[in-house]
């Protein structure tokens, strides 16, 4: 196989679009059920209005994952968008406050391994819970209650939720340190479930072996 | 330790309130509730699961939309409903899920009804079937080998939920009709194990 030479000026300049061998492709539609004006994206979009869409009414993720935001410039409530069809706003948002999705960006997938440390108090203090390669629909079942105030995402990409069973406001944890809940844009340290974000275009582990 | 007459009675406990945010009339249940109105609750608007996994239903008699409920606090309807399009702010019956074994769950899914067509096997959670290689956004039938599972219309466990149990009709869910009274299509894009 001959590798194509790519001139240095065309190299991706680390904006974090996850250019590590995978593709990102998403189609946003102005109306519900994949109707109306549409726009195909393969990189981040700070404001859907820039693409002449007034709003986002439905979404098809062809390869991802992506992260949507309630407001432009990647602000406000977060919505994890994994490969699949999202025909209406309530298929990605659990918040009755807002049906708005105004910006979106590719979501980094770090490694096939997943490890996260949750702490009861800010600054990585108080009781600690380690989760390795598993999803936890109720932190209560593991001795925690409803309070998580700081997080270390050691490997992988994770998403935490206010309520058990992956309900309520979502907060994404990309590999990194989150000393205080305001670093994940929460207004209170409330988290009752947490899960991994996985996709076979990045890592085959856990994929279907169809027969 | 006091020996209980019913050894299972400590395994499931739900505390319910008839107002949101744990307000109003309160009651504890450790077994099935076929109809909350018959127990003096016109509806349940907040609750706490103290032990075990439960399934709640929109209507009396375990009918209508299903809500899988694991340990934790559910102060308002958006904490248990995954679908805002069909707004359900109440729960009128509920029962324990007795077969949940989170770590040892196994499920077979089939492209067509009656266990026909392409087959896939799961023993771990799957927040997006398309992302993990299931071609398409629908499932025709399920065979639950062990544990309890919940599948959802949309990725990330959103939309209508369908509970699949290994101890209900031998774990066989041959047709959409058998998934629940609210099931209209075979659209399924995420599946996960229920945690006891």
UniProtKB/Swiss-Prot annotation, chain A:
Residues 109-113 are annotated as: Connecting peptide. Residues 1-21 are annotated as: Disordered. It comes from the Eukaryota. Residues 1-23 are annotated as: N-terminal arm. InterPro entries: Beta/Gamma-Crystallin (IPR050252), Beta/gamma_crystallin (IPR001064), G_crystallin-like (IPR011024). GO terms for molecular function: structural constituent of eye lens. Residues 200-211 are annotated as: C-terminal arm. One of its GO terms (biological process) is visual perception. The keyword Repeat applies. Residues 24-63, 64-108, 114-155, 156-198 form the Beta/gamma crystallin 'Greek key' domain. Gene3D superfamilies: Crystallins. Keywords: Eye lens protein, Repeat. Has a two-domain beta-structure, folded into four very similar Greek key motifs. Belongs to the beta/gamma-crystallin family. Homo/heterodimer, or complexes of higher-order. The structure of beta-crystallin oligomers seems to be stabilized through interactions between the N-terminal arms. Crystallins are the dominant structural components of the vertebrate eye lens. This is Beta-crystallin B3.
Swiss-Prot record, chain B:
The keyword Repeat applies. Pfam families: Crystall. Crystallins are the dominant structural components of the vertebrate eye lens. GO terms for molecular function: structural constituent of eye lens. SMART domains: XTALbg (SM00247). PROSITE patterns: CRYSTALLIN_BETA_GAMMA. This is Beta-crystallin A4. Has a two-domain beta-structure, folded into four very similar Greek key motifs. SUPFAM superfamilies: gamma-Crystallin-like. GO terms for biological process: lens development in camera-type eye; visual perception. It comes from the Eukaryota. Belongs to the beta/gamma-crystallin family. Residues 99-104 are annotated as: Connecting peptide. InterPro entries: Beta/Gamma-Crystallin (IPR050252), Beta/gamma_crystallin (IPR001064), G_crystallin-like (IPR011024). Residues 1-11 are annotated as: N-terminal arm. Keywords: Eye lens protein, Repeat. Homo/heterodimer, or complexes of higher-order. The structure of beta-crystallin oligomers seems to be stabilized through interactions between the N-terminal arms. Residues 12-51, 52-98, 105-146, 147-195 form the Beta/gamma crystallin 'Greek key' domain. The lineage of its organism: Eukaryota, Metazoa, Chordata, Craniata, Vertebrata. Signal peptide: none annotated.
């Amino acid at each position: 196989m001959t590798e194509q030479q790519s001139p240095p000026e065309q190299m991706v300049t680390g904006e974090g679009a996850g250019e590590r061998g995978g593709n990102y492709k998403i189609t946003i539609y102005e109306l519900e059920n994949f109707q109306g004006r549409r726009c195909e994206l393969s990189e981040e979009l700070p404001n859907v209005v820039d693409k002449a869409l007034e709003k986002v009414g439905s979404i098809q993720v062809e390869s991802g994952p992506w992260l949507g935001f309630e407001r432009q410039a990647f602000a406000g409530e977060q919505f994890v968008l994994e490969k699949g069809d999202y025909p209406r706003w309530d298929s990605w948002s659990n918040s009755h406050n807002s049906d708005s999705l105004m910006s979106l960006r590719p979501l980094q997938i770090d490694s096939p391994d997943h490890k996260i440390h949750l702490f009861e108090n800010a600054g990585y203090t108080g009781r600690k819970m380690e989760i390795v390669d598993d999803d936890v629909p109720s932190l209560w079942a593991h001795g925690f209650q409803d309070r998580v105030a700081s997080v270390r995402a050691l490997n992988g990409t994770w998403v935490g939720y206010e309520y058990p069973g992956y309900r309520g406001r979502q907060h994404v944890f990309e590999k990194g340190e989150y000393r205080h809940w305001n670093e994940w844009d929460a207004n209170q340290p409330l988290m009752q479930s947490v899960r991994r974000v996985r996709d076979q275009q990045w890592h085959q582990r856990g994929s279907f072996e169809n027969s | 330790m006091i020996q209980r007459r019913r050894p299972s009675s400590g395994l499931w406990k739900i505390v319910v309130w008839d107002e949101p945010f744990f307000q109003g009339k309160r009651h504890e249940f450790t077994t099935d509730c076929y109809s909350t109105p018959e127990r003096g609750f016109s509806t349940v608007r907040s609750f706490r699961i103290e032990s075990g996994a439960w399934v709640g239903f929109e209507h009396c008699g375990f009918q209508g939309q299903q809500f899988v409920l694991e340990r934790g606090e559910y102060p308002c309807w958006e904490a248990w409903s995954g679908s805002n399009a069909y707004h359900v702010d109440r729960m009128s019956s509920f029962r324990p899920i007795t077969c949940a074994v989170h770590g040892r769950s196994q499920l077979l899914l089939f492209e067509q009804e009656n266990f026909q067509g392409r087959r896939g096997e799961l023993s771990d959670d799957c927040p997006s079937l398309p992302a993990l290689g299931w071609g398409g956004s629908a499932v025709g039938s399920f065979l639950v080998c062990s544990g309890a599972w919940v599948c959802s219309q949309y990725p990330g466990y959103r939309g209508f939920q369908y509970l699949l149990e290994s101890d209900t009709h031998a774990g066989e869910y041959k047709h959409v009709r058998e998934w629940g009274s609210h099931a209209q299509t075979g659209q399924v894009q995420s599946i996960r194990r229920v945690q006891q």
